[in-house]
């Protein structure tokens, strides 16, 4: 079993079998270029997980409390919050188990610990897949609300949204189970990478199309009211900035992790790739940072949700 928290498996779960390690990470003693390794202390890792846990729990509680938020759009936001919550919980659980094992406070048989590691692996992987699917579902929901506004309520019903969410979780659990089973197969790694790229392309296409449509609509209104051209440009720049932040956060937080998976499949023994593998803990921390940012982008911008959140906080006190 690994002796330190930095020796994590592919998904950040606990890898206890030495025979599995070569599949997940190349040997650390390879000769090659000097590596830059960014250390993420366990304390910081735990703090990020706790912030994400509290933040996403509040989002779920606010949506559950207010019946006005029981709409398809907020169902997808709630699904995203639940996924992000599980990402933080699974990483918190993993870090806690590793720390307890390191200090000798937790004693267990190797088979029991291995089974626990597999459970955490499945939990982490399924929550990550469902989080990506939820981001794609939110983008599609917003796209339909703009381009099919008159038919939106007949296309995106609450029942269909719930079925879509159920399908997302079923697919996430199934895919994560298969991935953990065949983690040492290159095809399994590439499937996850292709899935991430598909979500990135889907979100980029949908949001760019929405931005173009919004700019055209703003120009039409400006011509109608005979506004000045700089006003139109300012609105377009604001929309472009919002789009850049939305897609930029997604890519910066998730991209390094999937780059890690790609390099494991492409160059597992190359010295340069080995340098990147040493920062795997940082890549997991970036994903947890994304679970902290998601509520700020998708949930807390809603005035109704913020009002309900205040009520939840006041009630808890």
From Swiss-Prot:
Main localization category: membrane
Source superkingdom: Eukaryota
Topology, Extracellular side: 1-37, 94-118, 184-191, 267-279
Compartments it resides in: Cell membrane
GO CC annotation terms, alphabetical: plasma membrane
Matches recorded under PROSITE patterns: G_PROTEIN_RECEP_F1_1, G_PROTEIN_RECEP_F1_2
Membrane-spanning segments: 38-63, 73-93, 119-140, 164-183, 192-211, 241-266, 280-300
Cytoplasmic side stretches: 64-72, 141-163, 212-240, 301-317
GO terms, biological process: adenylate cyclase-activating G protein-coupled receptor signaling pathway
Keywords tagged on the record: Cell membrane, G-protein coupled receptor, Glycoprotein, Membrane, Receptor, Transducer, Transmembrane, Transmembrane helix
Glycosylation sites: 29
Record's bilayer topology term: Multi-pass membrane protein
Leader sequence segment: none
Pfam family of the protein (one): 7tm_1
Similarity remark: Belongs to the G-protein coupled receptor 1 family.
Assembly description: Interacts with MGRN1, but does not undergo MGRN1-mediated ubiquitination; this interaction competes with GNAS-binding and thus inhibits agonist-induced cAMP production. Interacts with OPN3; the interaction results in a decrease in MC1R-mediated cAMP signaling and ultimately a decrease in melanin production in melanocytes.
Protein name: Melanocyte-stimulating hormone receptor
Organism: Eulemur fulvus fulvus
């Amino acid at each position: 079993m690994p002796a330190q928290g930095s020796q994590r498996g592919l998904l950040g779960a606990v890898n206890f079998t030495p025979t599995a390690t070569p599949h997940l990470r190349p040997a650390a003693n390879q000769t090659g270029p000097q590596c830059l390794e960014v250390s993420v202390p366990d304390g910081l890792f735990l703090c990020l997980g706790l912030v994400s846990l509290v933040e996403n729990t509040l989002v779920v509680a606010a949506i559950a409390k207010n019946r006005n938020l029981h709409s398809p759009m907020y169902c997808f936001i709630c699904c995203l919050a639940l996924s992000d919550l599980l990402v933080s919980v699974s990483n918190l659980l993993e870090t806690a188990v590793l720390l307890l094992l390191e200090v000798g406070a937790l004693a267990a048989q190797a088979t029991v610990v291995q089974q626990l590691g597999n459970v955490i692996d499945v939990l982490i992987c399924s929550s990550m897949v469902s989080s990506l699917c939820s981001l794609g579902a939110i983008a599609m929901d917003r796209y339909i609300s703009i381009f099919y506004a008159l038919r939106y309520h007949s296309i995106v019903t609450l029942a269909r949204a719930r079925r879509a969410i159920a399908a997302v979780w079923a697919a996430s659990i199934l895919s994560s189970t298969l991935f953990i089973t065949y983690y040492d197969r290159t095809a399994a790694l590439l499937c996850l990478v292709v899935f991430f790229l598909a979500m990135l392309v889907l979100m980029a296409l949908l949001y760019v199309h929405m931005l173009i449509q919004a700019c055209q609509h703003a120009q039409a209104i400006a011509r109608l009211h005979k506004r000045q051209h700089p006003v139109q440009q300012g609105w377009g720049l604001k929309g472009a900035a919002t789009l850049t932040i939305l897609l930029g956060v997604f890519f910066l937080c998730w991209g390094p992790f999937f780059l890690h998976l790609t390099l494991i499949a492409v160059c597992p023994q190359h010295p340069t790739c080995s340098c990147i593998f040493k920062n795997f803990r940082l890549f997991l921390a970036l994903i947890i940072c994304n679970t902290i940012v998601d509520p700020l982008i998708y949930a807390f911008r809603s005035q109704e949700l913020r009002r309900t959140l205040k009520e939840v906080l006041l009630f808890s006190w």
